[in-house]
């Protein structure tokens, strides 16, 4: 516990809360260009090949974004839109790539939760 004199000499500093998605800079989404598209393996109890992309954003940040859904058409130099939202079993992946926006196609043959995957309504 500091004394009154110590507090007068050095007042308490308010700790700033750490942001979960700093690269978005308070925006809901950001546009970027894929610099690398690859697969990676998840943390311990899970096993898969998760599709991710390294994205250089318009504000200069370079982030890793998860590509949701089955199958994708992304490659290097694809222009994508990212949103916040981490992937729990992939360390360092704090963003999601939006499907059906810019160069990213929606998921084929998707019947339910279509809006999340940019799929059009089936006829």
From Swiss-Prot:
Q: Which GO terms describe its biological process?
A: translation
Q: Which residues carry this modification: 3-methylthioaspartic acid?
A: 89
Report the GO molecular function annotations. Answer: rRNA binding; structural constituent of ribosome; tRNA binding
Question: What GO CC terms are in its UniProt record?
Answer: small ribosomal subunit
Indicate yes or no for the key word Chloroplast. Answer: no
InterPro entries, sorted: NA-bd_OB-fold, Ribosomal_uS12, Ribosomal_uS12_bac
Which key words are in the record? Answer: Methylation, Ribonucleoprotein, Ribosomal protein, RNA-binding, rRNA-binding, tRNA-binding
Question: Which PROSITE patterns does UniProt cross-reference here?
Answer: RIBOSOMAL_S12
Q: Which PANTHER family match?
A: 30S RIBOSOMAL PROTEIN S12 FAMILY MEMBER
Checking HAMAP family in the record gives: Ribosomal_uS12_B
On assembly, the entry states: Part of the 30S ribosomal subunit. Contacts proteins S8 and S17. May interact with IF1 in the 30S initiation complex.
What functional role does this protein have? With S4 and S5 plays an important role in translational accuracy. Interacts with and stabilizes bases of the 16S rRNA that are involved in tRNA selection in the A site and with the mRNA backbone. Located at the interface of the 30S and 50S subunits, it traverses the body of the 30S subunit contacting proteins on the other side and probably holding the rRNA structure together. The combined cluster of proteins S8, S12 and S17 appears to hold together the shoulder and platform of the 30S subunit.
The text of the family note is: Belongs to the universal ribosomal protein uS12 family.
- The name of this protein is Small ribosomal subunit protein uS12
Q: Origin organism of this chain?
A: Rhodopseudomonas palustris (strain HaA2)
Question: Taxonomic classification, please?
Answer: Bacteria, Pseudomonadati, Pseudomonadota, Alphaproteobacteria, Hyphomicrobiales
């Amino acid at each position: 516990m500091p004394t009154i004199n110590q507090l007068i000499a050095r007042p308490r500093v308010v700790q700033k809360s750490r942001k979960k998605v700093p690269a978005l800079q308070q925006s809901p989404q950001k546009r970027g260009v894929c610099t690398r598209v690859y697969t990676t393996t998840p943390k311990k109890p899970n096993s898969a090949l998760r599709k991710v992309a390294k994205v250089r954003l318009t504000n200069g940040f370079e982030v890793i974004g998860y590509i949701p859904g089955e199958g994708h058409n992304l490659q290097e130099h694809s222009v994508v839109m990212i949103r916040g939202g981490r992937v729990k079993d992939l360390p360092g992946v704090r963003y999601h790539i939006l499907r059906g926006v810019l160069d990213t196609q929606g998921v084929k043959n998707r019947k339910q939760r279509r809006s999340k995957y940019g799929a059009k309504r089936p006829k």
